[in-house]
């Protein structure tokens, strides 16, 4: 199974699960701190999370994994050389399965665009609610950092 389409299954799911989600989480954590306690409209982040994950699952389950399993079967029956050959990869079934990946890619891209829309909204102010900023301890994050440090020193 090594070197067949099962390798991208592992690469796409594991790398995005570890580094992609970690990166998005760190970005959102940092953006939350930069927002000085202002409340977010959370629906774009929620929908972005689910569409990105559903898109990745569709990409893997509709295309990469089925092709990888077909290649594994072909490698067991005829050898790895055949499973990786153009003769096998250009059959009608594998071609259709490769095109099925577009569904998952489209859903994934919609989630990425929604996340981008949310981040752009943080810059323009449209991703914030009109509620009062969140207060932590006696300090209000809506104060500039210099005033927070000056107040803490008193």
Model-derived segments and spans:
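Aromatic- and carboxylate-enriched substrate-binding clefts and catalytic-loop regions
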Residues: 136-138
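Membrane-interface interhelical connector segments
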Residues: 1-7
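Peripheral terminal and linker regions in Fe-S/redox and tRNA-modifying enzymes
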Residues: 131-134
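Hydrophobic cores of alpha-helical transmembrane segments in multi-pass integral membrane proteins
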Residues: 7-35, 40-90, 97-127, 140-145, ...
């Amino acid at each position: 199974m090594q070197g067949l389409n099962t390798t991208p299954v592992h690469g796409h799911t594991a790398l995005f699960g570890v580094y992609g989600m970690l990166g998005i989480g760190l970005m959102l954590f940092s953006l939350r701190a930069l927002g000085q306690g202002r409340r977010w409209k959370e629906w774009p982040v929620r929908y972005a999370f689910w569409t990105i994950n559903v898109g990745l699952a569709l990409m893997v389950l509709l295309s990469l994994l089925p092709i990888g399993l077909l290649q594994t079967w072909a490698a067991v029956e005829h050898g790895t050389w055949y499973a990786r050959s153009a003769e096998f990869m250009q059959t009608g079934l594998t071609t259709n399965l490769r095109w099925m990946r577009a569904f998952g890619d489209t859903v994934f891209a919609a989630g990425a665009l929604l996340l981008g829309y949310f981040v752009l909204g943080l810059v323009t102010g449209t991703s914030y609610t009109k509620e009062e900023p969140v207060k932590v301890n006696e300090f209000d994050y809506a104060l500039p950092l210099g005033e927070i440090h000056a107040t803490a020193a008193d």
